[in-house]
Amino acid sequence: MAVPALWPWGVYLLMSLLSLGSCLDTLEVCPSLDIRSEVTELRRLENCSVVEGHLQILLMFAATGEDFRGLSFPRLTQVTDYLLLFRVYGLESLRDLFPNLAVIRGARLFLGYALIIFEMPHLRDIGLPSLGAVLRGAVRVEKNQELCHLSTIDWGLLQPAPGANHIVGNKLGEECADVCPGVLGAAGEPCVRTTFGGHTDYRCWTSSHCQRVCPCPRGLACTVGGECCHSECLGGCSQPEDPRACVACRHLYFQGVCLPTCPPGTYQYESWRCVTAELCGHLREVPGHATAFGIYEGSCLAQCPPGFTRNGSSIFCHKCEGLCPKECKVGTKTIDSVQATQDLVGCTHVEGSLILNLRQGYNLEPELQRNLGLVETITGFLKIKHSFALVTLGFFKNLKLIRGDSMVDGNYTLYVLDNQNLQQLGSWVAAGLTIPVGKIYFAFNPRLCLEHIYQLEEVTGTRGRQSKAEINPRTNGDRAACQTRTLRFVFNLTEEDRILLRWERYEPLEARDLLSFIVYYKESPFQNATEHVGPDACGTQSWNLLDVELPLSRTQEPGVTLAPLKPWTQYAVFVRAITLTTAEDSPHQGAQSPIVYLRTLPAAPTVPQDVISTSNSSSHLLVRWKPPVQRNGNITYYLVLWQRLAEDGDLYINDYCHRGLRLPTSSHDTRFDREDPALEAEPEQGCCPCQHSPPGQALPALEAQEVTFQKKFENFLHHAITIPKAPWKVTSINKNPQRDSERHRRETGLLRLGKNNSDFEIHEDKVPRERAVLSGLRHFTEYRIDIHACNHAAHTVGCSAATFVFARTMPHREADGIPGKVVWKAVGKSSVILHWLEPPDPNGLILKYEIKYRRLGEEATVLCVSRLRYAKVGGVHLALLPPGNYSAKVRATSLAGNGSWTDGVAFYITGPEEEDTGGLRILLTVTPVGFMLLVMLAALGFFYSKKRNSTLYTSVNPEYFSASHMYVPDEWEVPREQIAIIRELGQGSFGMVYEGLARGLEAGEESTPVALKTVNELASARERVEFLKEASVMKAFKCHHVVRLLGVVSQGQPTLVIMELMTRGDLKSHLRSLRPEAENNPGLPQPALSDMIQMAGEIADGMAYLAAKKFVHRDLAARNCMVSQDFTVKIGDFGMTRDVYETDYYRKGGKGLLPVRWMAPESLKDGIFTTHSDVWSFGVVLWEIVTLAEQPYQGLSNEQVLKFVMDGGVLEEQEDCPIQLQELMRRCWQHTPRLRPTFVHILDRIQDELRPSFRLCSFYYSPECQRGQASLLPTEAEPDSPPTLNGASDYGPPNGDPGH
């Protein structure tokens, strides 16, 4: 077998491997990644060679194809668990994204699947040319309406058992142009043919990338040249028979080598690599968790197997003698479910405290005993509260000691509160439980007899430590209802997912006797709830409860917010006061409200379920679905939208005369023949649904697996997606359907399927039931149909998100007929051209034509003509025909099949004696006429150009707007056609600021993300020139810590200034987003001291550079520092900060806006701005970093700040401010300017604490700084002069002078 035939894609793969460098030497391991919402999140994969865990890429609804252009992660070679892709819009192939992904190991699977590609609306091919192995698990590719090249993949080459794969609901193979390289005249050598699923075909991932088929024995991998790799290699290699040159390892990886077993002194970890004992000892299953890994039988494990434990400081697992002692460090652990006890299995010594809060469940004791039954010692306290599911505490059958190292409220070692069904303390009395310190507390345990508590006092040795009130006889063991006072609700407010309540203040005789309130609530479709708070008839807890602390003010009414609740659901609620009676002779006191019923507000429903469709004619589609799982109101109608989809134009590329043509169909969905779901009775509320299957009859295994997967996947979606309210309101649907359809398409992103789909109108209808008939459709055309559920509150909450289905109408039997007659024209001696018109409205696309022609007295010949061949001449050229009389007829073949034959046309071929001289006569006539026309056009063009160039530009004030004010394009000029605008970033003082892409701006980069500053359309020529001159100041700056100017577009409108894009915005916004209570918190921790010093160093470095360039900033503040994607802080802005933070400025004496809270005293007094005054501002920026961007001098007005600073005041010290930063601030705020340090001196003090990367890119470590370091003099600006650094901000100077 020839190597070139095996490897037509070898050059591509070779380049990919070269881009990896030494495959295993540079391994970078990343943990599991969940990448969603934004395409930029994919950058987290940038340095990953292996994803140790799973990789999920999902829910990118706003993405477009352009967002993925140039995005590639060639370093990624393997994923150890599974790869999941779900609803990523705009992504057409994984070919460029993961060109070298070679192995999916499947160590942990997603419900049995290692590769899941689900509902990817724009994916056209999988395109993983390097993928060579899916070691474990099946493949699920489902509901991807544009996905092709599935029939050309031999999954048997990738998987040991491909029979479990689930590949359904994708684009029909008959509609796909699944042509492999080298087939039907395609470029390259043909791919290898294999047999899979009984079908022999060429194997490829795309039309330009073959599937890898190695000519090696025993399934070995191979190089791009077909040479066999080492037996330990998997997925390919760069050198044959070299275990160091593998793309991935078949068994184990260690220090760049693939090995069958781990070397001595190393241990297997995560089934694919070897680690040292030292590294294993540092691993944690949960980062930051105390429990360390252990080594057992050559493997590094998260915990030792049963019967084994770690002894002391040893990392190795040893067999226990008898019962394994197991120490578990838990801190203070709350157990609110059986699952929460699973990490205590086998624990005998609990170092910490346990809080049991088991409110729901039935017959939990066996499972709790299995998980907690070995516990002998608790070093802290044991608190059992609100555990309505507990009847006994016997599951602590071995508990012998509660040591009391920490106690509840500093007093109680055992605390048992409000356990409505607790009856027994188990074997504690018999086992001799000891409580050496602290008290015990029992209250509100109505079924727990007092004698059990008194016995426990004796055994534990706590008798006499606690008062009678701490074991209250009236709240323990008292089944009878106590005499209580009625509480009255005074306020309630309902929302979609919450209820706000307030009730009257209850005051017992002794105010200190009132401890708290408990609010009980539950769903109650009928107003028949009782106050019983134990398990219901089904054994589950009926009431939810919430502790409410007493208000601090005695006049304030207590209240609570119940959340999260279900929309449009009736809840029963009552409140009970928890009291403690200290006086022995005092009557029992208590208070409780009656049960009230409240209904939450409606919300948008969830999506309709199980939508199906079929076609019963060429112009109709039938659609049916089931109601949403959560209606969140009364469903009043369904909004149905449908749009015609464009046919795949790529089908024209193939020559269907040479390729077997399998045509798409519009088969009837048999599910329509089943019973109408509308006729099935819904279960009555409050009753259990009946089982349709006979008792004991289970679903078939395959169907059960399918149901399980669908339920689990839908649960995953339910928890993973928060569907926002629809941005449109249903009440406006009938006002202007066309406008509303456009709005749907623009705002909700619906129906963005093909390149030309926007040319087709979106239709809509409202239907009252779960079915719709769509009429007036085009024959044999695919439609996307979206269904939204709308309830009675749709006018305020909107309808649900859409569920969608794709369906094709049936063909029209006459649509593929060729209109008119076939005509012919003789060309040459033995050739004719047959012309005919295409069917004006065919069934889908016309793929080919068939011409049946015959010479009189001979057999007919059938000629196939592809659509491309027809398009060249509008017919077919029949050549080399012998003389004689002929007849011919034509028929078209569309996606729906063959059309009807045309009527025959007769033509003849003349003999050799007849020659056509007409062509020469025509040529002699046309040539002179054409020459005269060319001369006339040239003359017109000359006069028009001369007139255009004579236009004069005048100035009303030529003395003021002189030549010196004109902007002259230079080497910074960028052609406008290289710029693409993506989205708005904000409004600057000159005009709008956009995010964009610039092509060819940087060497080696196809496109560069940039920020584009513009001038308003109504700006004068002077304003445009001033805008460009301000930007020109930045041309002199080239420092890593100053935002760079990248180019200028001065020719044409609008004028653009191209700046470096700082994706995380200004430092002030970034710091505020890191506050714990911030709504836009990105999930990042608050900055540590090292992070703060790094920010300070980067700002100081940028300011040192400006000082060396003799520039004074005059407005240094966090709002004027920008943060890049990698969190680097730079000096500069996008001209937006004054608009966003205008309150940070103050107008003094009718002049311009001044940033008084950041200004030095000499600047406030005399208007003097120097590098020393910038240092003062730097100190304020440090204060902003420490406080996460609080406003300086909070509580003082701008006038008060002016007086305070000029009188010698400085910002107050923060309690939690690091001493190092506080000292730096004090030095920056010296009132004598020359006593303040320079920026270089500041860097001298903190250089040792900056990250190593700072040395590589900073001005401070550059030769330019070292030369000028000793001679840096403060740069001064005269009072009220224009700002020296015009380019640093896009608004006017602080003193209000326009600068000219």
UniProtKB/Swiss-Prot annotation:
<feature type="modified residue" description="Phosphotyrosine; by autocatalysis">
    <location>
        <position position="1145"/>
    </location>
</feature>
<comment type="subunit">
    <text>Probable tetramer of 2 alpha and 2 beta chains linked by disulfide bonds. The alpha chains contribute to the formation of the ligand-binding domain, while the beta chains carry the kinase domain.</text>
</comment>
<dbReference type="GO" id="GO:0043560">
    <property type="term" value="F:insulin receptor substrate binding"/>
</dbReference>
<dbReference type="GO" id="GO:0004714">
    <property type="term" value="F:transmembrane receptor protein tyrosine kinase activity"/>
</dbReference>
<feature type="active site" description="Proton acceptor">
    <location>
        <position position="1115"/>
    </location>
</feature>
<dbReference type="InterPro" id="IPR001245">
    <property type="entry name" value="Ser-Thr/Tyr_kinase_cat_dom"/>
</dbReference>
<dbReference type="Pfam" id="PF07714">
    <property type="entry name" value="PK_Tyr_Ser-Thr"/>
</dbReference>
<dbReference type="InterPro" id="IPR002011">
    <property type="entry name" value="Tyr_kinase_rcpt_2_CS"/>
</dbReference>
<dbReference type="InterPro" id="IPR006211">
    <property type="entry name" value="Furin-like_Cys-rich_dom"/>
</dbReference>
<feature type="domain" description="Fibronectin type-III 3">
    <location>
        <begin position="818"/>
        <end position="913"/>
    </location>
</feature>
<feature type="glycosylation site" description="N-linked (GlcNAc...) asparagine">
    <location>
        <position position="411"/>
    </location>
</feature>
<dbReference type="GO" id="GO:0005524">
    <property type="term" value="F:ATP binding"/>
</dbReference>
<feature type="topological domain" description="Extracellular">
    <location>
        <begin position="747"/>
        <end position="921"/>
    </location>
</feature>
<dbReference type="GO" id="GO:0030424">
    <property type="term" value="C:axon"/>
</dbReference>
<dbReference type="InterPro" id="IPR003961">
    <property type="entry name" value="FN3_dom"/>
</dbReference>
<keyword id="KW-0325">Glycoprotein</keyword>
<feature type="disulfide bond">
    <location>
        <begin position="249"/>
        <end position="258"/>
    </location>
</feature>
<dbReference type="GO" id="GO:0005899">
    <property type="term" value="C:insulin receptor complex"/>
</dbReference>
<keyword id="KW-0597">Phosphoprotein</keyword>
<comment type="function">
    <text>Receptor with tyrosine-protein kinase activity. Functions as a pH sensing receptor which is activated by increased extracellular pH. Activates an intracellular signaling pathway that involves IRS1 and AKT1/PKB.</text>
</comment>
<dbReference type="GO" id="GO:0030036">
    <property type="term" value="P:actin cytoskeleton organization"/>
</dbReference>
<dbReference type="Pfam" id="PF01030">
    <property type="entry name" value="Recep_L_domain"/>
</dbReference>
<dbReference type="InterPro" id="IPR050122">
    <property type="entry name" value="RTK"/>
</dbReference>
<feature type="disulfide bond">
    <location>
        <begin position="214"/>
        <end position="222"/>
    </location>
</feature>
<keyword id="KW-0675">Receptor</keyword>
<feature type="glycosylation site" description="N-linked (GlcNAc...) asparagine">
    <location>
        <position position="528"/>
    </location>
</feature>
<feature type="transmembrane region" description="Helical">
    <location>
        <begin position="922"/>
        <end position="942"/>
    </location>
</feature>
<feature type="binding site">
    <location>
        <begin position="985"/>
        <end position="993"/>
    </location>
    <ligand>
        <name>ATP</name>
    </ligand>
</feature>
<keyword id="KW-0418">Kinase</keyword>
<dbReference type="InterPro" id="IPR036941">
    <property type="entry name" value="Rcpt_L-dom_sf"/>
</dbReference>
<keyword id="KW-0808">Transferase</keyword>
<dbReference type="InterPro" id="IPR000719">
    <property type="entry name" value="Prot_kinase_dom"/>
</dbReference>
<feature type="glycosylation site" description="N-linked (GlcNAc...) asparagine">
    <location>
        <position position="898"/>
    </location>
</feature>
<dbReference type="GO" id="GO:0071469">
    <property type="term" value="P:cellular response to alkaline pH"/>
</dbReference>
<dbReference type="GO" id="GO:0043548">
    <property type="term" value="F:phosphatidylinositol 3-kinase binding"/>
</dbReference>
<feature type="glycosylation site" description="N-linked (GlcNAc...) asparagine">
    <location>
        <position position="634"/>
    </location>
</feature>
<keyword id="KW-0472">Membrane</keyword>
<feature type="glycosylation site" description="N-linked (GlcNAc...) asparagine">
    <location>
        <position position="492"/>
    </location>
</feature>
<feature type="modified residue" description="Phosphotyrosine; by autocatalysis">
    <location>
        <position position="1146"/>
    </location>
</feature>
<keyword id="KW-0732">Signal</keyword>
<keyword id="KW-0067">ATP-binding</keyword>
<feature type="glycosylation site" description="N-linked (GlcNAc...) asparagine">
    <location>
        <position position="616"/>
    </location>
</feature>
